[in-house]
Amino acid sequence: MSEPENTAEDKDAEAAISADAVESETTADGGENPAEGESAEGPRMRARRERMERREAQRRAIALEQARREAKAAAKGKYVEQGKGAGRGKVQGLQTLLLVVLLALIAVGLGSILYFTPLMSVRQTVVTGTGVVTQEDVLGALSIPKGTRLLQIDTAAAADRVASIRRVASARVQCEYPSTLRVTIVERVPVAAWTGADGTHLIDRDGVDFANEPPPPGIPALDVVAPAPQDPTTKAALQVLTSLAPDLARQVAKIAAPSVSSITLTLDDGRTIVWGTTERTAEKAEKLGALLTQPGRTYDVSSPDLPTVK
């Protein structure tokens, strides 16, 4: 509601001002002569002073009332602006919520289409990294037929199935959209051969027995009790073998490790290398290269500070 144009206080103030004006005119036109005496002069001065004080008080009252009206109007306008701002915030929040819901529905719909559509299914499978392992072995372990929806394939589980092949060290399965499944494998490489009651076993650098077959040329024999990835003697022997320079490693016919502290190597020409423990292996390998240039049958590098030849 708008404020009334004239309040009761304003009317009283205006009436008082009008009365003062009339009194002033009466005094000016028909008042007593100032020369009538000093006895009448005192009351007139007091009346005039009182009128001036009343007028000043009325002016202050009017000014205060005006200020009050302006402050009230300003406050009312502020509340209106705040109400409008709150309304705009609610509208914007509702719009944002509707947009999020719409995008979520679109994403769900698109995901459902891609999940079930035959356009995003396996049409070809590409296998790379095979050598001894055949593509048929990989596809058989993969066990994902053509026509399978790509989004329905658990690639980690598929890679684990392929890696279960004994000769496979690692496998990776990737979906290449729109319709290709790619399988990448890394085959195990033999670094030693161990002979047991059931024949020869190929051992890789991690101590994994991955095949029962004759070793390829240049693969040394591993002489330990029972090779295994966590067997200490197997790990020690393979650590020494893989630390040798390639040209020297090719000359090794056998590496024996009855214990982790008594490792020996036998070369193709029958010479023996006493290695000892796996400590300071790099130094021992470096000293052995120079030591083998000297004639002898036994080369002892178990103490690399004092290598000997016999």
Curated annotation (Swiss-Prot):
InterPro entries per record: Cell_div_FtsQ/DivIB_C, FtsQ, FtsQ_DivIB, POTRA, POTRA_FtsQ_type
Protein family per UniProt: Belongs to the FtsQ/DivIB family. FtsQ subfamily.
Annotated ranges, domain POTRA: 120-188
First and last residue of the signal peptide: none
Protein name: Cell division protein FtsQ
All ranges on the Extracellular side of the membrane: 117-310
Cell cycle recorded as keyword: yes
Subcellular location: Cell membrane
Coiled coil (residue ranges): none
GO-annotated biological processes: cell septum assembly; FtsZ-dependent cytokinesis
TM helices/strands, residue ranges: 96-116
Residue ranges annotated as Cytoplasmic topological domain: 1-95
Record region (Disordered): 1-57
GO cellular component, one term: plasma membrane
Cited function: Essential cell division protein.
